[in-house]
């Protein structure tokens, strides 16, 4: 197993310092620190550009874009790429849609084994796996499906797994201001399987711990034990 760990917060850091540090971390999904601006009116224009690019790629590998089997390939690839990167067209505010509730709950909430698929930004090849996401509420909870949707939103972009893990943790921190957030992601990368080192069966594991999960060993251990526990209702 290949293991990588991404811990952005130092031990003992309080919540105020935590928020300041999170906001200062670099994010290559922004342009000069500004959010990516999406222009829905350009969808068809961008699709045509991608189709032209696919035709060039086909010609560059010695194929004929006009042969029967490839006639619709540029359109299919462009539409697939628009689907696989639709996370750029989503915002955290619209995704959550006010589904935050005052419950007074202060014990761990964990959604585990969330399937995700993303594209490596280096080779634009898929990586996929499972995400485990937990938080300890500070009187507020969010609809469980929203946690899975947050994973989906950030996965549907060009990514590296380390940044993806951190972005998910930061998003939950932003919407709930909980006592702590923990994210572990396990994935296999096609750029390591299909090309390059060509190592099928290798997995990359990344983690991001915020607040009590970073500062309290028992809390962190409880989370790690829970994601290893096999449910008995299957």
UniProtKB/Swiss-Prot annotation:
Keyword Zinc in annotation: yes
GO molecular function: GTP binding; GTP cyclohydrolase I activity; zinc ion binding
Name of this protein: GTP cyclohydrolase 1
Leader sequence residues: none
Cited PANTHER family: GTP CYCLOHYDROLASE 1, GTP CYCLOHYDROLASE I
Domain of life: Bacteria
This protein's pathway: Cofactor biosynthesis; 7,8-dihydroneopterin triphosphate biosynthesis; 7,8-dihydroneopterin triphosphate from GTP: step 1/1
Similarity comment: Belongs to the GTP cyclohydrolase I family.
Gene3D superfamilies: 1.10.286.10, 3.30.1130.10
Reaction catalysis annotation: GTP + H2O = 7,8-dihydroneopterin 3'-triphosphate + formate + H(+)
Gene: folE
Listed NCBIfam families: folE, PRK09347.1-2, PRK09347.1-3
Enzyme Commission numbers on file: 3.5.4.16
Residues noted as binding Zn(2+) in the record, renumbered to the chain: 120, 123, 191
Organism: Synechocystis sp. (strain ATCC 27184 / PCC 6803 / Kazusa)
SUPFAM superfamilies on file: Tetrahydrobiopterin biosynthesis enzymes-like
GO CC annotation: cytoplasm
Protein keywords: GTP-binding, Hydrolase, Metal-binding, Nucleotide-binding, One-carbon metabolism, Zinc
UniProt-listed GO biological process terms: one-carbon metabolic process; tetrahydrobiopterin biosynthetic process; tetrahydrofolate biosynthetic process
Quaternary structure, from the entry: Toroid-shaped homodecamer, composed of two pentamers of five dimers.
Xref: Pfam families: GTP_cyclohydroI
């Amino acid at each position: 197993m290949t293991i990588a760990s991404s811990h952005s917060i130092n031990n003992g850091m309080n919540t105020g310092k935590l928020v300041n540090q999170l906001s200062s971390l670099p994010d290559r999904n922004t342009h000069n620190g500004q959010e990516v601006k999406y222009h829905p009116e350009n969808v068809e224009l961008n699709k045509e550009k991608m189709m032209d690019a696919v035709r060039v790629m086909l010609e560059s590998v010695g194929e004929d874009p006009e042969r029967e089997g490839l006639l619709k390939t540029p359109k299919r690839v462009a539409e697939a790429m628009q689907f696989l990167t639709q996370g750029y067209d989503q915002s955290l505010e619209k995704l959550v849609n006010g589904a935050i509730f005052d419950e007074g709950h202060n014990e761990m909430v964990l959604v585990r084994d969330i399937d995700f698929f993303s594209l490596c930004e280096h080779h634009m090849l898929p990586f996929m796996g499972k995400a485990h996401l937990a938080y300890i509420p500070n009187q507020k909870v969010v609809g469980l499906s929203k946690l899975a949707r947050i994973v989906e939103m950030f996965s549907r972009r060009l990514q590296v797994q380390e940044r993806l893990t951190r972005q998910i943790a930061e998003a939950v921190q932003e919407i709930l201001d909980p006592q702590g957030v923990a994210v572990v992601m396990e994935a296999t990368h096609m750029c390591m399987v299909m090309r390059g080192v060509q190592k099928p069966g290798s997995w990359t594991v990344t983690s991001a711990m915020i607040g009590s999960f970073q500062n309290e060993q028992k809390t962190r251990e409880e989370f790690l034990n829970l994601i290893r526990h096999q449910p008995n209702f299957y």
